[in-house]
Amino acid sequence: MNGIPTPTVDIQWASDAPDAPDETHLCEWVRHAAIAAGGVVGDITLRIVDEEEIRTLNRDYRDKDAPTNVLSFPFEMPEGLPEGAMDPLVGDIIICAAVVRREANEQHKPLVAHWAHMVTHGVLHLLGYDHIDDDDAIVMETLEIRALGELGFPDPYSPAQQESQAQPENTELNP
C-alpha cells in the first residue's frame, strides 16, 4: 500500500455480532488507519466482544465500571526478554458490538460508518494518539476525519453527520 508499512491483523470474535462488518472490511480499516498514522509494522489483534467482557476490561484497566465502545492495549515487551525475542506485536483493540450498535442508533449514524470510526479510533489509540487535552484531540480527530474520508465515510464529528441517516458515499473499500 504505497510503500507504507501496514500491520498484520488478527480478528477474534468473542461475541455474536450479526450486524458487524465482515473481516475483510475490519482488516482494511485497521490497515488504513495505520497508514493514516504513518504506517506500522507488526501484529494487531482486533477482538469483537460483548458488553460483559468490555465492562470487565474497562473496570480492571480504567477503573470505569461500565461498558465502553473501544479499548486499546499497546503491547509492552515483558522485562528480561532480549530485544527482538518476539515477533513485532503492536497490541490489541477491543470493540463492543452492542455499544457500537447502540451509539450508532443514538447518534443517528449509519452503523457501518460508526464501526469504521471505532476501528480507526482504536488503531490511533494503539499507536499513541489520544484526546485527553484539546491539542491532542485536534490531532487525533483530524487523522480520523482524513482516514475515514479517504474510505468514503463522512466526518464522524460533524453535527450534520449526527443528524443524518444517509449512508456514506462508499460503503465498499477502495483497493
UniProtKB/Swiss-Prot annotation:
Query: What top-level branch of life does the organism fall under?
Result: Bacteria
* Positions of disulphide bridges: none
Q: Principal localization?
A: cytoplasm
Q: Provide the protein's localization.
A: Cytoplasm
| Species of origin | Alcanivorax borkumensis (strain ATCC 700651 / DSM 11573 / NCIMB 13689 / SK2)
**What is the protein name for this chain?**
Endoribonuclease YbeY
Keywords for this protein? Cytoplasm, Endonuclease, Hydrolase, Metal-binding, Nuclease, Ribosome biogenesis, rRNA processing, Zinc
Cofactor binding note from Swiss-Prot or TrEMBL:
Binds 1 zinc ion.
Q: Which PANTHER family match?
A: ENDORIBONUCLEASE YBEY, CHLOROPLASTIC (PTHR46986:SF1)
Give yes or no: UniProt keyword Repeat.
Answer: no
Keyword Cytoplasm on this protein? Answer: yes
The Gene Ontology biological process terms listed for this entry are:
rRNA processing
